[in-house]
Curated annotation (Swiss-Prot):
InterPro entries: DNA_Rcmb_RecR, Rcmb_RecR, Rcmb_RecR_Znf, TOPRIM_dom, TOPRIM_RecR. The gene is recR. The keyword NAD does not apply. CDD domains: TOPRIM_recR (cd01025). May play a role in DNA repair. It seems to be involved in an RecBC-independent recombinational process of DNA repair. It may act with RecF and RecO. PROSITE patterns: RECR, TOPRIM. This is Recombination protein RecR. One of its GO terms (molecular function) is zinc ion binding. Pfam families: RecR_C, RecR_HhH, RecR_ZnF, Toprim_4.
Amino acid sequence: MLYPTPIAKLIDSYSKLPGIGIKTATRLAFYTIGMSDDDVNEFAKNLLSAKRELTYCSVCGRLTDDDPCSICTDPTRDQTTILVLEDSRDVAAMENIQEYHGLYHVLHGLISPMNGISPDDINLKSLMTRLMDSEVSEVIVATNATADGEATSMYLSRLLKPAGIKVTRLARGLAVGADIEYADEVTLLRAIENRTEL
């Protein structure tokens, strides 16, 4: 069915979001059109505000509204441990369990030879710089249990062990192929408590 151009454009915009197919995009577009002008204006304002005000922490790579972020500047955090994650959403999942008190480093992706993503394509250089100028003695690799997550964790292990840094990874209470951001708090807590050395 042909929709008027403004709705078709809105459907197209929604369908560009991850996990949103054409049917859901259509539903969202029609819902948005049915919202009050005040609600639409607030939604648009919040979207633009988030886009303008958020940045990536220059230290850890986490999405934040201050740089460096509040975790990197918190003197009460354990400065000897860095938890390496794929995505900023994973930081939020780990913080929710309130059991890990060290620092983070967000890679913004994983090494994926099949997709042409090499170590140079993810946020590894800044991790190496951090490790050279710090008291970090352990790096916990918390990549998802996928082929790319495993490739990334093995690469980090081979890179860091010769430097005398202990490299561990989360215990596998996480199902293979599962995303950390969707894991429940008990599973994440057990994974961090029972991490294994690589």
